[in-house]
């Protein structure tokens, strides 16, 4: 009862804080100069991170197993991982714009996880026999860590494409669409150009030079982050194969989740392979990574919507009225 009450309090604190952060985020989209509000948003995200950490620890202690048994718990863990990825660049360099990319994903994931749509999964339950294994923490945590990392890397590639081609399509016009501002792509370009201008006041630099520098930097970031995510995904799939052999007597069953995990792995393998070809670096490889962003969400969330296959434990269902 104590742990259930604590989890309830931490969840409400997290949801309330993230709601305030979303409001601040929307305000700063309209008024870029409100530096104080942006700092308040970062403090709110830190408070939410500690609330999530407290929730995960409480759920782990009360249930006796690592909290990854259903979609609700995995979403909480995914948002917790995104918070870490959001924080690391700021610790290394307070002016690193990589954290700017992760902000919307972190906010939206946590907002959905703590909303009322997953109320039926809020209560901790006893694991089904197939999940009562030490492989649960190893396999699922590796998969979620890889998803979070690959999502960030894919967003960096998407930012590269949008910044490079935004003038070619009316859809990406800042005057007509708030899409760029919502995901901070224009903010990155603005901050980078401003910072470069301060460093190069002794001689004139053309705007296209800032654009070139920024896209090259995004390309480098994307490659590094996706390489890490691909490694984690490979380890996660291998752990899952070993666990499947112990539980079901077969390393691979072409279950829908397994099939889409293989598709995800293939997409990012193609991305990494394309990086070895100089002609495919930059725009072409970024396009592959951007496709991977959608594939990850299908693999992770889309399959849970269907609730089919061997990986249907804790699948998503709409609350009944």
Curated annotation (Swiss-Prot):
Cellular component, GO annotation: chloroplast thylakoid membrane
Coiled-coil regions listed in the entry: none
Pfam families the UniProt entry points to: Cytochrom_C_asm
Membrane-spanning segments: 9-29, 44-64, 68-88, 143-163, 225-245, 259-273, 288-308
Its membrane topology: Multi-pass membrane protein
Main location: plastid
Gene Ontology molecular function terms on file: heme binding
PANTHER family reported in the protein's UniProt record: CYTOCHROME B_B6 PROTEIN-RELATED, HEME EXPORTER PROTEIN C
Record's function text: Required during biogenesis of c-type cytochromes (cytochrome c6 and cytochrome f) at the step of heme attachment.
Record protein name field: Cytochrome c biogenesis protein CcsA
Organism the protein comes from: Sorghum bicolor
């Amino acid at each position: 009862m104590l742990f259930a009450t604590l989890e309830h309090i931490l969840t409400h604190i997290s949801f309330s804080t993230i709601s305030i952060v979303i409001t601040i985020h929307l305000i700063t989209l309209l008024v870029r100069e409100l530096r104080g509000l942006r700092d308040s948003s970062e403090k709110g995200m830190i408070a939410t991170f500690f609330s999530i950490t407290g929730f995960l620890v409480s759920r782990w202690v009360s249930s006796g197993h690592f909290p990854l048994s259903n979609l609700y718990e995995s979403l909480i863990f995914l948002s917790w991982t995104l918070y870490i990825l959001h924080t690391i660049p700021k610790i290394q360099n307070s002016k690193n714009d990589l954290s700017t990319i992760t902000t919307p994903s972190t906010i939206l994931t946590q907002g959905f996880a703590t909303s009322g749509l997953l109320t039926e999964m809020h209560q901790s339950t006893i694991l089904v026999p197939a999940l009562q294994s030490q492989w649960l923490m190893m396999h699922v945590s590796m998969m979620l860590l890889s998803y979070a990392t690959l999502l960030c890397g894919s967003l960096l590639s998407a930012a590269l494409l949008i910044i490079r081609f935004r003038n070619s399509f009316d859809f990406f016009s800042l005057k007509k669409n708030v899409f760029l501002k919502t995901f901070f792509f224009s903010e990155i370009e603005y901050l980078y150009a401003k910072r470069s201008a301060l460093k190069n006041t002794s001689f004139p630099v053309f705007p296209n030079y800032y654009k070139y520098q920024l896209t090259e930097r995004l390309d480098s970031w994307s490659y590094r982050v996706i390489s890490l995510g691909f490694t984690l995904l490979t380890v996660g799939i291998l752990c899952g194969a070993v666990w499947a052999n112990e539980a079901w007597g077969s390393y691979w069953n072409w279950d829908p989740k397994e099939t889409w995990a293989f598709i995800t792995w293939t997409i990012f393998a193609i991305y990494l392979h394309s990086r070895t070809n100089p002609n495919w670096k930059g725009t072409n490889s970024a396009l592959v990574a951007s496709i991977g962003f959608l594939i990850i969400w299908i693999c992770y969330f889309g399959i849970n919507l269907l609730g089919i296959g061997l990986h249907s434990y804790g699948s998503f269902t709409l609350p009944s009225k």
